[in-house]
């Protein structure tokens, strides 16, 4: 399908792209496309390394004492349930 594209067809496609997007926006679009490709490549590499790490990890059953400690939920700083009610501000200015 693409084997039949010659130089005139490619030039025509490039001219249409320049007319559609404008010459000023093309460098920014190419830069963002490059960043997206780089991010996609790094994410794919990270997924492969995670898969290799999961395969290399031993499949021992979890220790019951250890799993109970992992399930403990700690309160977040500024947790609403443990905070005191806010008092109304006193009016310090005189009218």
Curated annotation (Swiss-Prot):
The keyword Calcium does not apply. It is a single-pass membrane protein. It is found in: Cell membrane. NCBIfam families: PRK00575.1 (NF001854), tatAE (TIGR01411). Part of the twin-arginine translocation (Tat) system that transports large folded proteins containing a characteristic twin-arginine motif in their signal peptide across membranes. TatA could form the protein-conducting channel of the Tat system. The Tat system comprises two distinct complexes: a TatABC complex, containing multiple copies of TatA, TatB and TatC subunits, and a separate TatA complex, containing only TatA subunits. Substrates initially bind to the TatABC complex, which probably triggers association of the separate TatA complex to form the active translocon. This is Sec-independent protein translocase protein TatA. It comes from Streptomyces coelicolor (strain ATCC BAA-471 / A3(2) / M145). The gene is tatA.
């Amino acid at each position: 399908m693409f084997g039949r594209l010659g130089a005139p067809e490619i030039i025509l496609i490039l001219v249409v792209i320049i007319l559609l997007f404008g010459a000023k926006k093309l460098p920014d679009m190419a830069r963002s496309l490059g960043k997206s490709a780089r991010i996609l490549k790094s994410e794919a590499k990270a997924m492969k390394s995670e898969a290799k790490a999961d395969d290399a990890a031993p499949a021992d059953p979890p220790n019951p004492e250890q799993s109970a400690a992992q399930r403990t939920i700690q309160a977040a700083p500024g947790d609403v349930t443990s905070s005191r009610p806010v008092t109304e501000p006193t009016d310090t200015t005189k009218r």
